[in-house]
């Protein structure tokens, strides 16, 4: 299967990343990526952009040379209540919100706390997808989290970089998440988690896991722009007419 959507990328606005949005566009074109989300880290990360960066994403064109750009954020889950580090009053400025755990904001503790925090973020209604839920630094009750994600229609990310360099030891957890999502009716999204444009759309490990698990293609949001956009609209996000022809 050809995947044409990447929901997780970073730019130089997160200063441990090395590409601009402009850098991503020719790579997207060359790789057949029709839609990607710019999702820099939420403001509570030490080197993240100020929240004005996200508020001002409306200056970006919707489509450049046939490639769509979604305005997003990888917010931080801050506490056991599932709160995130982006002001709710500005949420309408974004097309999507991804949220996850990052050690500088939420120090790892115990499985019960991680699980409750993630489930509360899912239940909050503010989060469209959970980033790298298979991170072994933050063990969770996978069955409980996937059940909540299915019930509240929040996508779970398969993060391709988790299998290579970012979060060693993730594969077993990710496999269990895929299998639970398959059985419980949850949605998956694929993220390259690119911190440099060259890795945009790299999903080889994600594809391998869903293929081995027999995960249904119709619940993989990376398969087409329409699949992702319909999912976001079903969660109450705004219709984006400029993406009609992607």
Swiss-Prot record:
- Named cofactor requirement(s): Zn(2+)
Which residues are Zn(2+) 1-binding? 8, 10, 74, 193
Kindly state a single biological-process term from the GO annotations of this entry: bacterial-type flagellum-dependent swarming motility
Q: Which InterPro entries match?
A: Phosphatase_YcdX_put, PHP_dom, PHP_phosphatase, Pol/His_phosphatase_N, Pol/histidinol_Pase-like
Q: Where are the transmembrane segments?
A: none
What SUPFAM superfamilies does the database record attribute to this sequence?
Answer: PHP domain-like (SSF89550)
Give the record's keywords alphabetically. Answer: Hydrolase, Metal-binding, Zinc
Q: Return the broad EC class.
A: hydrolase
**Could you tell me which HAMAP family the record lists for this protein?**
YcdX_phosphat
**What is the protein name given in its UniProt record?**
Probable phosphatase AHA_1344
